[in-house]
Amino acid sequence: MAHLAAILSVPREKDYATIAAMPIYAYAILVAGWLLWLTPFFRARQSEKPAKQVDRRARWGILLVAIAYCLLWQGRFWERSPRPWQVALSIVFFALASVLSWTGARALGRQWRIDAGLSADHELITSGPYRFVRHPIYTSMLGVLLGTGTLITPWWLLLPSLLLFIIGTEIRVRIEDNLLASQFGDRFAEYQKRVPAYIPFPK
């Protein structure tokens, strides 16, 4: 009975103070960061080319990445008050993610798609951010994960989230690379040897 009464009781003033611990600017960073990152994908989706070949196994990677994102929000983030360095780092991650999503979607044009697939007149894109990484969209997704996690997620949730993201992204990268290799042969092999997948380390 005491437990039920505690659940039904009206929150006290200090409870509201706890709920409001996360400052409004942190919410603004989250909303702005996600919206700026997502907008080019919604626009690209409207002009997506039909695919002639799709490998649906990549959806397992999509599922793992989705779970990774969900983990970011499982902590009581509304009670967290991020430190200045966390706020600054989060803004940097979101900014980089947004730049990559806009430039990557623009370079892909109508070839952008969620599934791993090839269109009938598919082109090998090596311009824009594709000069530095073969999958800049995935780099931008990593930036959003780190931008969100730095701001609101405790480390014991951020680490498994990052691990799931890497596993899911590796699945997608390998499947997409195999599709591109089957289409472009030696030309893609040379590009793959020269340019890293989604983390811009020099090869």
Residue ranges and their predicted role:
Residues 7, 12-126, 144-203:
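Membrane-anchoring alpha-helices and their flanking helix-loop junctions
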Residues 127, 131-139:
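Histidine-centered phosphotransfer motif of kinases
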